[in-house]
Amino acid sequence: MRTKQVNLLITLVAVALFSFSCFSIYRITQTNNQLINCRNHILEFKENMLHLRNKTEKNTQEMMKVLNRMKYEITKREILSGNLVAQKADILNKNETVSNTFEDLKFFFPHLRKEGRIYPDVIIGKGKTGVSFALGISTVNRGNYSYLKQTLTSVVSRMTLSQEKDSVVIVLVADSNEDYLHSVVKMITKKFKRQVRSGSLEVISIPAFLYSSMLNAKHLAEASQKLASWRIKQVLDFCILLLYAQPKAKYYLQLEDDIIAKEMYFTKITDFVGNISSNNWFFIEFSMLGFIGKLFRSEDLTHFVRFFLMFYKEKPIDWLLNDIFQVKVCDAGEDLRNCMKRKKQIRIQYKPSLFQHVGIHSSFPRKEQYEKKI
């Protein structure tokens, strides 16, 4: 009897343990399923958050672009309201010779003959004229590198207020990249407020229609072709800048966007020009490197430009500057020594140089230059 009771008790315990085991297994399975579902929900949530973040970043970038564009438009309108944007029609009416000179471009570029009046886009300017010196700086986008702010700071800060009043600095943005144009305008209006307000600092750009598509180096495959196109465009950029500056001042000084003007440079230039006894000079070199630091009489600029335009495809502009002497100074069959002697008399060199070249990264993509002494 007692044995049966023990067996029954064991059976009941076994059944209870089995039931508990089944229940535990069921609960564990259910919990695992819930954990799996929870994990899936977490992963899905993470994916949604990642997608949302990417979308937010994209929207933020788009909003920043729109905001920058709005800031540029606001700045432009403020300049307009402050009478800081020169009116092209007024300028052309006062300077018909300028209009006629720009019209000469149609002779060299047939694709311009269908266009109306040819004139740079004046972004910042008061149409300042009647000064002694115009200083021209052509700038293009160099990617992650820019020397323009450093250049302008040295150029304008090393003038006295009276010298600043008797001069105008012209920045030509010779780049089709609108973002670069906006960045230059923003930097100048923020950093050089006094010069902008007084009209002593101007910003102009080249209309898109001015250069034909053949000058777009992006469409050229060979590196040599791209370099040739870059040099051609550089000559044309300088020509536009010279023509624009011609009616503004008595003298024109050519600079570049990657140089530093030395202390008292402007005083030294004005003193040197004022003390030249002979008036028979062609131009004065305040730098020996390239086209930097060349001072011209503004009345001669049109003749230089026409010569450059005749041979703009053949050589860089500083080489063309040498060639013009062979045409203007040397007679056919003349002894070279006599020609060089006359050349020194009308091509005056100032030493030491008043400008230091600092740009390592050239405006030509992936080209570096380390020539410093100018």
UniProtKB/Swiss-Prot annotation:
Keywords tagged on the record: Differentiation, Endoplasmic reticulum, Glycoprotein, Golgi apparatus, Membrane, Signal-anchor, Spermatogenesis, Transmembrane, Transmembrane helix
Lumenal side: 27-374
Family according to the record: Belongs to the glycosyltransferase 54 family.
Record note on quaternary structure: May self-associate; specifically in the endoplasmic reticulum prior to its translocation to the Golgi. Interacts with MGAT1, MGAT3 and MAN2A2; may interact with MGTA1 specifically in the Golgi.
Principal place of residence: Golgi
Compartments where found: Golgi apparatus membrane; Endoplasmic reticulum membrane
GO MF annotations, alphabetized: acetylglucosaminyltransferase activity
Keyword Transmembrane: yes
Bilayer disposition of the protein: Single-pass type II membrane protein
Sugar attachment sites: 54, 95, 144, 275
Cytoplasmic side: 1-5
Highest rank taxon of the organism: Eukaryota
Tissue: Expressed in testis. Poorly expressed in testis biopsies from men with impaired spermatogenesis.
Function recorded in the entry: May play a role in male spermatogenesis. In vitro acts as inhibitor of MGAT1 activity causing cell surface proteins to carry mainly high mannose N-glycans. The function is mediated by its lumenal domain and occurs specifically in the Golgi. A catalytic glucosyltransferase activity is not detected. May be involved in regulation of Sertoli-germ cell interactions during specific stages of spermatogenesis.
Protein name: Alpha-1,3-mannosyl-glycoprotein 4-beta-N-acetylglucosaminyltransferase-like protein MGAT4D
Species of provenance: Homo sapiens (Human)
